[in-house]
Amino acid sequence: MKIYETENYEEMSRKAANILSAQVILKPDCVLGLATGSTPIGTYDKLVEWYEKGDLDFLEVKTVNLDEYRGLTRDNDQSYYYFMHEHLFDRVNIDPENTNVPNGTEPDADKECERYEKLIESMGGVDIQLLGLGHNGHIGFNEPDSAFAQTTHCVDLTESTIEANKRFFASADDVPRQAYTMGIGTIMRAKKILLIVNGEAKADIVAKAFFGPVTPEVPASILQLHNDVVIVGDKAALSKIPR
């Protein structure tokens, strides 16, 4: 496990974008595993900036996203499909046919999970998987006590997640109750994992996940057993790790 400490969010984003862009340059048809949320936005902005300067070419790049809400249409501005197009896909020259996000409107959840898992396998697996880190150590929608061997699956969202999401929707009834997520087993099969984290609020869980015991109670702790993990965090997020 390699840990890079940065001064701030901007520097963290630049470092993460450097690692992703190196993968694209070394293997133009690479498979990138991508994440959503506020943390990777700066990373995507950097990739777009370098694409606009002519330093990066996404024409052959393939992507698979970590998760998606079940029940949201792709034109819903809270869907992760929408997020990815807004922050990256529509801003670079990636082929839309090469971008993959779980289909939130597929009525058969088991069918969609099986399709997505087989899709990842058919692409030869993920070359580098970008991850954020939840306050309780979750990665994707793999909450505490998720099975480490689990593949892509549909999860019931926790009440705290549903409550936190209410502010993004017009009505509480519109808030998704389920989501598709790559399982921890799927994530662990990525050839390389890049986890980005920032802010003092994440300091405790960073120390617990990466310097505490490997346990399903802290899903991200399993990453200690992966043979190629890079953590990029700002000073605040890394302030409680052993020195």
Name every feature range the model reports, one short phrase each.
Residues 2-115, 119-122:
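N-terminal active-site beta-alpha-beta segment that forms phosphate/nucleotide-binding
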Residues 4, 72-78, 82-86, 90-243:
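Conserved phosphate- and dinucleotide-binding cores of soluble alpha/beta proteins
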